[in-house]
UniProtKB/Swiss-Prot annotation:
EC number: 3.6.5.3
Subunit annotation: Monomer.
Protein species of origin: Chlorobaculum parvum (strain DSM 263 / NCIMB 8327)
NCBIfam families: EF-Tu, PRK00049.1, PRK12735.1, PRK12736.1, small_GTP
G4: annotated segments: 136-139
Entries under InterPro entries matching the protein: EF-Tu_GTP-bd (IPR041709), EF-Tu_GTPase (IPR050055), EFTu-like_2 (IPR004161), EFTU_2 (IPR033720), G_TR_CS (IPR031157), P-loop_NTPase (IPR027417), Small_GTP-bd (IPR005225), T_Tr_GTP-bd_dom (IPR000795)
Segments of this protein annotated with the region G1: 19-26
Protein name (Swiss-Prot/TrEMBL): Elongation factor Tu
Gene: tuf
Region entry G5, spans: 173-175
Amino acid sequence: MAKESYKRDKPHVNIGTIGHVDHGKTTLTAAITSVLAKSGKAAAREFGDIDKAPEERERGITISTAHVEYQTDKRHYAHIDCPGHADYIKNMITGAAQMDGAILVVAGTDGPMPQTREHILLARQVNVPALVVFLNKVDIADPELLELVEMELRELLTEYGFPGDDIPIIKGSALNALNGDPEGEKAIMELMDAVDDYIPEPVRDVDKPFLMPVEDVFSISGRGTVGTGRIERGIIKVGNEVEIVGIKPTTKSVVTGIEMFQKTLDEGQAGDNAGLLLRGVDKEALERGMVIAKPGSITPHTKFKAEVYILKKEEGGRHTPFFNGYRPQFYFRTTDVTGSVTLPEGVEMVMPGDNLSVDVELIAPIAMEESLRFAIREGGRTVGAGSVTKIVE
């Protein structure tokens, strides 16, 4: 049977469900697929099928994530749901599932709980652009309590820097929707309308400023130096001016040739593995870990704040805690750079399995911006992961 071609007639958006354990994230994910399946916009997925999510490895970390696809009249969605709380934290920090927006699920019977707060904070830290709230289990909650829960939620969202007064809060019962109850199904359709309208359409990678991390360097006698790598974003054309950023002082050059699979091209774009021939650049001046980018689009830095997750011993991480001044390697894009860690005030040590905010100072500058992900390594072994939350200098 011929494979169905992927139709690009609708914008593609990545979303996920977040929230406290047992508040109904997976039930909601199953309900969305079952309701949309009735109009042929999804394949219905069972709760149990989503709940026993396969394990994946991202930056050396094993994460269980369920991927579900569906569409509305306006968009095509890829939706992720994680069975365990630790999986959520790892997912958000490693960016394994980059979210353009998220549905925060809160049980109306409980209101915001510790993980609700933690997921909102993480969403803020790793720059999830927008949240929509699904207030679940409203069929078994006291209506007066629901009003209080909604107020409390709006305050909590505002406290963490989201527009709490404007965020859509949809009330419903995911379980009833899953069981085919018309009221339940109506709430799911309302939720999808809110997601369509409130979660902004992401800028496609090709529309962003050009950037390619350097993986390897060659010199072609009589022609110059070639940097190879996978183009992370944007488009590059022969004759474009670029900057070489990171590790050493920033230099400028011009792309005089683009090669892909031994063929010469006029342009390369996001996702392509390409070799860029650079005018007037010595082979020694280019090395793995640098990036070739649109001039002025990215700058090199050594000091930043980050949200990090430290692997548990069972996940192949450290067996012992670390302390202030810990000096591992930070793996950005294609290379390791040593850096020292400063712990927040009042934190004496970090145990395997912890997630927290830290300050880092690298021994060499790396091209970086907020939301850039990295792995924390010791001698090539991954012991943690992080996301840049703020550049200091």
